[in-house]
Amino acid sequence: MSKKMNSTPKKDGFWMPGEWEKHDQCWMIWPERSDNWRLGAKPAQRVFVNVANAIAKYEKVTMLVSHQQFENARNLLDQNVRVIEMSNDDSWMRDVGPTIVKNKDGEIRGVDWVFNAWEGFKGGLYFPWDKDDAIARKVCEICNIDYYRTDFVLEGGSIHTDGDGTLYTTEECLLNENRNPDLTKEQIEENLKEYCGVEKVIWLPLGVYNDETNGHVDNLLNVVSPGHVVLTWTDDTTDPQYERSKLAYDILTNTLDAKGRKIKVTKLHQPGPLFITKEEAEGIDVCDTMSREPEQRMPASYANYYIANNAIILPIFGDKYDDLAVKTLQSVYPNHKIETVMAREILLGGGNIHCITQQQPTTK
């Protein structure tokens, strides 16, 4: 039976493992909001199917689906993808799912952060969000694992860890007044250390340009292994992303991680720039959610990939830099197969493959 813990993971000897460590399964949520996904979410659903089926070749996948969409999802997904009915507000499993922590004996627990739709009442991307805020606890109940409920607003995409004491995040997101306005930077860092079980937090100033999540770190970089990250990059000094990536690069290459290692940074050239077309914008229902406008620049990034067991599930865009991204990642993951998925439809919704997935680490 799953129960709520009254301490913190760090006090109990738990920490957030690296995403490159072995998984038991991956969790996702089926898209259906017509005010975020164009044409009634049908194009996005096809891409989610491709992502889930690609991951399922390497590890188990569970897709959470509303009652209304259950039969549709079940018919479209491969039979080896488990489908479970669960109410939800949208499909960003990385941000609403539990952060899984483990201890030295291989036991796992979940961290249930407060979710407020990326800015709460001061600018959240949709309302209400109570169904999404309940997903982490429900997943822990399904898995029969204990969990920690925090009073701290955080989305899973706003943090990356190396599994060895170091956590990466951005000031643009975690210091945003729409997250935890009553906490100082030092208090926020202490929360990260307590609930992720880390020793050092590396703060990067900014995320990817025009990222509506206020600069989630998972769109800016990904962790290859302890002491090694890939970083979204452009050599175009006139591109607004250049200064953002340069600031991150300078900090990363002049900072030691929690174990005293110099951090190796592999530059991963960004796609595009990519912009929303008039046809794409007109396919999204207009209401009180975040609007999508023609010629709006999208926060496209190849760093927003999922590390499966022995594979990298990489978003591509039909862009001239797709092949370079594959080559770059194959060089840093020589023992992984690079599985590419055309992912523009996810990008149109505001994120990408890492944003719609959440790994569950293996237990001993």
From Swiss-Prot:
One of its GO terms (biological process) is putrescine biosynthetic process. InterPro entries: Agmatine_deiminase, Peptidyl-Arg-deiminase_porph. It catalyses: agmatine + H2O = N-carbamoylputrescine + NH4(+). Pfam families: PAD_porph. Keywords: Hydrolase. One of its GO terms (molecular function) is protein-arginine deiminase activity. The active site is at residue 355. Its EC number is 3.5.3.12. Belongs to the agmatine deiminase family. HAMAP family: Agmatine_deimin (MF_01841). This is Putative agmatine deiminase. It comes from Mycoplasma mycoides subsp. mycoides SC (strain CCUG 32753 / NCTC 10114 / PG1). The lineage of its organism: Bacteria, Bacillati, Mycoplasmatota, Mollicutes, Mycoplasmataceae.
